[in-house]
């Protein structure tokens, strides 16, 4: 065939000159020989005539020069496409391929190279079978991607710092709520003590010092109890409260009997009686109220003590009855706030009893003692009206303060749990899948061409470098995370695997694969190999799947092939929503 073409060109020098002008610069003799054959077979009327050209033919050629030039350029393009397909393995749209193959019929190319297409490569891999991930850990090649390591290390540092700032902000919120509740309780106590001090203008200097000391001790105890136990406030059970009331009953009875005996036997002046009664009252109050304020459910214990309605009823009943000493003891055991009212509003009460009861720490007791100091010039009926009105006022104030304290305390205890649950509350939707899928469709094509360039998927290929290069070609980054195997609670552990490292690969917040090895490079190589196996299928799909993370199941975006089902996925090394 080549001899026939050379003989034809030697006989027609004009055709030979015309064809030689169509040769490209740098085109090899082998390529040009076959492409010249293609041009001559399909030139037709485009080639000049073999003999001497006449004037008439030249004029006709000039008239049709525009059409001839277009046809000539099309013929040259077809010849170049055919040569690229034969010698370089290029492929074109189906219409173009059919056209150039039909034009090249009869041309025999004996020394053309052979190329493997992507579809043929995938078919070969399927026939050969894909090795499982449970095989021995293979040694990676010497090439390492330094940029990937640096970027993953920087991202891990950013994740750690963000977690620390979130914890610090949560602690600041808890401390601020504790301080706010303590300030509210102190303001309530100060308001009550200021109202009492306005009525207590006629009392002695000793009584004022005792009342100021009691109010300051109450505020300090409230602040310590609020700040120490605010986050762990729990309601005490009924059995514990019953045993506590029995202890109070015994302590109050003992102190009341001692005080009555001392008043009967002592003939000392009023000043010594005042000092003794104040000391005994301070001891009884410290024994009664310190455990109440130190308990975890302080707000719920104070609620029945300060704002209970039976306090006013027992106070009014104590006025009408003359057996007031026994009734005052029993009522003070049931409700601490009513003890002073029943004992102070009784007729013929001594001044020592009034001053001793001034040292109690509840506001209703102090108000009742002030009423008792004024009872010398008033009747028992007027005392009943004043005591009931003051008791109702103290009940309203105590109710408002106790309600605010009880509403604050459970909110503090649940603040940490609500923050931890809201922290990762956003759920993945199909919109997230639709946003990620186009990128991985492009990545599938890029990885396929990279595999064709290196001769297909094989153990000799640096899988990590190939995957990273394909992702960087699409202007994205490969996220790499490392965790020691012993820190994973969702994997079985034995002595041989204690020192292993687990690697997880992600891209665009989508999970690609997990690998385990004795070093970070080894683990990354295994994870990259598992990720590349997905791209050997016909199609890759982004799906929302369940994965384990620290003992619980979470949702994650996972890259899978079209046929596989998400069963027994490896546990997540980090929470996916931390990385979004």
Swiss-Prot record:
The keyword Nucleus applies. GO terms for molecular function: p53 binding; RNA binding. GO terms for biological process: DNA damage response; negative regulation of cell growth; positive regulation of cell growth; positive regulation of signal transduction; regulation of protein stability. One of its GO terms (cellular component) is granular component. Induction: Up-regulated during replicative senescence, in response to DNA-damaging drugs, telomere unprotection and oncogenic Ras-induced stress. Induced by proteasomal inhibitor MG132. Up-regulated at G1 and G2 stages of cell cycle. It is found in: Nucleus, Nucleoplasm. May be ubiquitinated. There is a cross-link at residue 184 (Glycyl lysine isopeptide (Lys-Gly) (interchain with G-Cter in SUMO1)). The modification N-acetylalanine is found at residue 2. Keywords: Acetylation, Isopeptide bond, Nucleus, Phosphoprotein, RNA-binding, Ubl conjugation. The keyword Ubl conjugation applies. Residues 129-356 are annotated as: Disordered. Residues 185-228, 274-313, 321-356 have a biased composition (Low complexity). Residues 168-179, 248-269 have a biased composition (Polar residues). Its main location: nucleus. InterPro entries: dsRBD_dom, XTBD. Residues 155-167, 231-240 have a biased composition (Basic and acidic residues). Residues 19-133 form the XRN2-binding (XTBD) domain. Ubiquitously expressed. Residues 462-537 form the DRBM domain. The modification Phosphoserine is found at residues 131, 241, 389. Belongs to the CARF family. Regulates DNA damage response in a dose-dependent manner through a number of signaling pathways involved in cell proliferation, apoptosis and senescence. Interacts with CDKN2A/p14ARF, p53/TP53 and MDM2. Interacts with CHEK2 and MAPK3. Interacts with XRN2. This is CDKN2A-interacting protein. It comes from Homo sapiens.
